[in-house]
A protein has these predicted regions:
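Conserved donor NDP-sugar-binding/catalytic core segment of glycosyltransferases
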Residues: 178-217
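Short, surface-exposed loop/turn segments at beta-strand-coil junctions that are enriched for proline
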Residues: 92-100
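Short beta-strand and strand-turn-strand segments in soluble, beta-rich domains
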Residues: 14-18, 57-77
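Low-complexity, acidic Ser/Thr/Pro/Gly-rich terminal tails and inter-domain linkers that flank the onset
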Residues: 2-28, 125
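Short, flexible, basic/aromatic active-site loop/helix in glycosyltransferases
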Residues: 201, 217-248
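Donor nucleotide-sugar recognition loop
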Residues: 245-252, 262-274
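Short beta-strand-to-loop acidic/aromatic patch adjacent to the donor-nucleotide binding site
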Residues: 165-180
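N-proximal low-complexity "stem/linker" segments adjacent to membrane-targeting elements
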Residues: 131-158
Length: 274
């Protein structure tokens, strides 16, 4: 751990002296670990009571100090920390979206009552560069069905070239799915921003099917709370698609609907016609 420099420590019942810290690399939308050593520099003991009492937590602020995430994940104390005693704590840190420059501010909180900073104690304020979730923009495609000449032509025409090896994200399509030229770029943008699953809009050719797929109609923006599974999703390593409306789909959190990434779907494209 790296030693923390000198900082103001108030006189009173509740005061923290930050001694050392170690923070793992932060990637957008991903949890990592931090380890901190701190001393009870006040006159009152610190006690955790399950999810209540004194907890170690954090805020994410922008470079100007505006809160981005105020209530970070809590870490309870392993024991009562008496005045003058030190303790080491491991903290799970969930990085914000999108990547960029942030301030990661650790503080103690008396749960449901106050943060120690509010009663005069100094928090630990660290500059952190949150990196993109994916280290490289490498998108591959899995075709669920027989080869299709039109689908292949649409994939070759992508603005951002697809890869056949060492993909960091895999998009799941069906024969007759025709992604727009900017589709691959928009999916990779979503992964880079911090989402494990990114799915686009579906433009249905068959009129009889349009009501069935109305929730995925093109023309919308970006929505991390669509309320429906993503269709024809792009998924990071470790995720597998399910099925919804007879298409590859993803249901779960950590997902973004990218309404500008449009896939035109011919009739009978891997599903029964309505």
């Amino acid at each position: 751990m790296e030693r923390v420099g000198e900082h103001p420590v108030p006189v009173g019942p509740l005061a923290v002296r930050w001694l050392a810290c170690e923070v793992e690399e932060s990637r957008a939308g991903v949890t990592s670990r931090a380890r901190l050593r701190l001393e009870n520099a006040g006159s009152a003991p610190w006690r955790s009571r399950g999810r209540e009492g004194v907890q170690l937590a954090y805020h994410w602020l922008d470079p100007l100090g505006n809160p981005i995430v105020w209530d970070g994940i809590r870490a309870p104390l392993p024991r009562v920390v008496e005045p003058g005693e030190a303790v080491e704590l491991d903290v799970t840190v969930a990085a914000p979206r999108p990547p960029g420059s942030y301030r990661l501010v650790f503080d103690l909180v008396e749960e449901l009552r106050f943060w120690f900073q509010e009663v005069g104690s100094a928090p630990l304020d660290l500059p952190v560069e949150v990196r993109p979730r994916i280290s490289e923009r490498r998108l591959g495609v899995v075709l669920h069905g027989k080869p299709d000449a039109e689908t292949e032509a649409a994939l070759v025409a992508q603005e951002e070239r697809l890869v056949s090896e060492n993909a960091l994200a895999l998009a799941h399509l069906v024969p007759g799915a025709l992604p727009a030229p900017d589709w691959s770029r928009l999916l990779l943008d979503g992964h880079e921003e911090g989402y494990a699953a990114v799915g686009g809009a579906v433009e249905i050719v068959a009129r009889s099917d349009r009501r069935r797929y109305a929730a995925w109609t093109p023309g919308g923006g970006r929505n991390p709370r669509l309320g429906q599974p993503l269709l024809l999703p792009s998924l990071l390593d470790g995720l597998e698609p399910g099925r919804h409306e007879d298409l590859p789909a993803f249901s779960g959190s950590d997902a973004l609907f990218e309404g500008r990434a449009v896939v035109r779907l011919r009739p009978r494209s891997g599903r029964p016609s309505g």
